[in-house]
Amino acid sequence: MRRPNKAPPAASKDGPRINDDIRNAQIQLIDQTGDNKGTVETVVAIKMAQEAGMDLVEISPNTSPPVCKIMDYGKYKYSAQKKAAEARKRQKTVEIKEIKLRPMIDDHDYDVKMRAMQRFFEEGDKVKITLRYRGREMAHQEIGTKLLDKIKTDVAELAKVEQDARFEGRQVVMVLAPR
């Protein structure tokens, strides 16, 4: 049994409607210099755009009548793509940096880790502190708890605790986020 012939689905276009895609009988027209020409028939507006060597682009389709502008659509589309690319370039993704510690850390090593943490916060990144216990250190978990409390107080003006300290097997994990 044969299937009945179906028309292919209409391709949905991205962006505003231009020229003959505008279906309204009348539109609010803005010319290429930005002057408001008032309510004009769509056919006349398309003719005006073609005489100027430009396109009629629907700016605001939801108003009554829709607002259309005479402009170079290729140039408009190109500048919109450039703006979007620039916005993507400027957008910073927040990374989670990890700092690994041991409960019996020396003072100088602690200072080095704190400087690294401070640099991460200045860059706008979150910091995941992993405190790993080895061997008999598990019997003295209060040392690790004191160390994490000391870290919290030392970075209090730079960061806030996003996820409080919690055990994951033989390690304690805490996440700090910049203020």
Swiss-Prot record:
Q: Which Pfam families match?
A: IF3_C, IF3_N
Q: Which domain of life is it from?
A: Bacteria
Entry GO MF terms: ribosome binding; translation initiation factor activity
What the entry lists under InterPro entries is as follows:
T_IF-3_C_sf (IPR036788), T_IF-3_N_sf (IPR036787), Translation_initiation_fac_3 (IPR001288), Translation_initiation_fac_3_C (IPR019815), Translation_initiation_fac_3_N (IPR019814)
- Keyword Ubl conjugation present in the record's keywords: the answer is no
Q: Which GO terms describe its cellular component?
A: cytosol
| Location within or outside the cell | Cytoplasm
User: Its GO biological process terms?
Assistant: ribosome disassembly
Alphabetically sorted, this entry's keywords are: Cytoplasm, Initiation factor, Protein biosynthesis
Which NCBIfam families does its entry note?
infC (TIGR00168)
Q: What does this protein do?
A: IF-3 binds to the 30S ribosomal subunit and shifts the equilibrium between 70S ribosomes and their 50S and 30S subunits in favor of the free subunits, thus enhancing the availability of 30S subunits on which protein synthesis initiation begins.
Q: How does it assemble?
A: Monomer.
The UniProt entry's sequence similarity note says: Belongs to the IF-3 family.
What is this protein called in UniProt? Translation initiation factor IF-3
